[in-house]
């Protein structure tokens, strides 16, 4: 349920199918991990357990993982939750006096509930300020679009996405680097929202991802 084939993305339009397939796979990975601490992504509340880093390929914070952020130069000691950090979030708060950044030694991208709430409040203040400045309508760039947590996907799924779209990368990338590259491309795909939603609903109703995965696993 965490994979998709190039054929799947070509039916109903490459872009719409690709977006629908990635969203479906990320949602499925999150649902499958509900009993073990996996979550749905950047803006979803959740709770994790306490302490250091786990394997970079884990879907959701592992037992004993700490928040991946540094604040004022010090690594956060709070338990990692289900929300994840990204360069997009870093950019959205870079204009504020919030001295938080990703700890380069962290082997995951999950953050604690404290920092998740802090980031949300900073972004909300930014949106309100934009609304006040222009008389009620926030600038387009300040609209907080839903975030798909690509870190929930398996490494093989990310590699298949990279191969399908022929994304230029160097060999030996780890999961965090793949997520960043795939995420930048994924957010840049122009799609028709109606087509994407229609394809997504169709895939879910027909359990399409699961059947495609069985066929694809037989090929590989």
UniProtKB/Swiss-Prot annotation:
Cross-link (Glycyl lysine isopeptide (Lys-Gly) (interchain with G-Cter in SUMO2)) at residue(s): 87, 194, 205, 214
Outcome after substituting residue 112 to A: Abolishes zinc-binding
MF GO annotations: DNA binding; transcription coregulator activity; transcription corepressor activity; zinc ion binding
Cellular component, GO, one term: histone deacetylase complex
Annotated compartments: Nucleus
Keywords: DNA-binding, Isopeptide bond, Metal-binding, Nucleus, Phosphoprotein, Repressor, Transcription, Transcription regulation, Ubl conjugation, Zinc, Zinc-finger
Zinc finger (Atypical): 67-115
Region (Interaction with NCOR1): 1-129
Broad class of the protein's primary localization: nucleus
Region described as Disordered: 123-143
Residues with Phosphoserine modification: 131, 138
Any single Pfam family the record assigns to this protein: zf-SAP30
Reported tissue expression: Expressed in all tissues tested with highest levels in pancreas, ovary, PBL, spleen and thymus; lowest levels in brain, placenta, lung and kidney.
Family assignment from sequence similarity: Belongs to the SAP30 family.
Subunit organization: Component of the histone deacetylase complex that includes at least SIN3A, HDAC1 and HDAC2. Found in a complex composed of at least SINHCAF, SIN3A, HDAC1, SAP30, RBBP4, OGT and TET1. Interacts with HDAC1. Interacts with SIN3A, SIN3B, HDAC2, RBBP4 and NCOR1. Interacts with SAMSN1. Interacts with HCFC1. Interacts with SAP30BP.
Function comment: Involved in the functional recruitment of the Sin3-histone deacetylase complex (HDAC) to a specific subset of N-CoR corepressor complexes. Capable of transcription repression by N-CoR. Active in deacetylating core histone octamers (when in a complex) but inactive in deacetylating nucleosomal histones.
Full protein name: Histone deacetylase complex subunit SAP30
Organism: Homo sapiens
Organism ancestry: Eukaryota, Metazoa, Chordata, Craniata, Vertebrata
